[in-house]
Design a protein with these regions (language model features):
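Long, charge-rich boundary regions
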Residues: 114-118
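Accessory C-terminal segments flanking Radical SAM cores
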Residues: 2-109
């Protein structure tokens, strides 16, 4: 569905997601969830592991990072995460891909400047 919607988009379409995340949504990239990559804070505290799963809150960022079993979350690691493609876990993975290597950055530049060139 995303591939059909986003595959031949007009130049004027503005999205607030990274180009590699949009490619992930279109099925052109594979990523693992990075559940700690987009932490949520609200009046109840720091929500773990992400705002989609209701697994409680902690009062400090340190508690969130050190006391959450991050390896227990993500597609294939937790049944609640099955079929998830939401930005709160996968956008961080796409950003890591972008800035983790020169080739990732080059892919992002190409997609940004030439979105319909494949």
């Amino acid at each position: 569905l995303f591939s059909k919607i986003l595959g031949n988009r007009k130049r004027g379409w503005q999205f607030n997601q990274s180009p590699l995340f949009l490619e992930f949504l279109m099925g052109k990239r594979e990523y693992q969830c990075t559940p700690w990559g987009n932490p949520t804070y609200n009046v109840f505290g720091w929500q773990r592991p992400c705002y989609l799963l209701q697994e409680g809150y902690v009062s400090s960022f340190r508690e969130l990072m050190e006391q959450t079993d991050w390896d227990s979350y993500g597609t294939g690691r937790n049944e609640k995460c099955a079929d998830c493609m939401v930005h709160c876990g996968y956008e961080a993975s796409a950003v890591e891909d972008t800035f983790g290597s020169f080739s990732g950055f080059a892919k992002t530049v190409k997609i940004t400047l030439l979105p319909n060139a494949r």
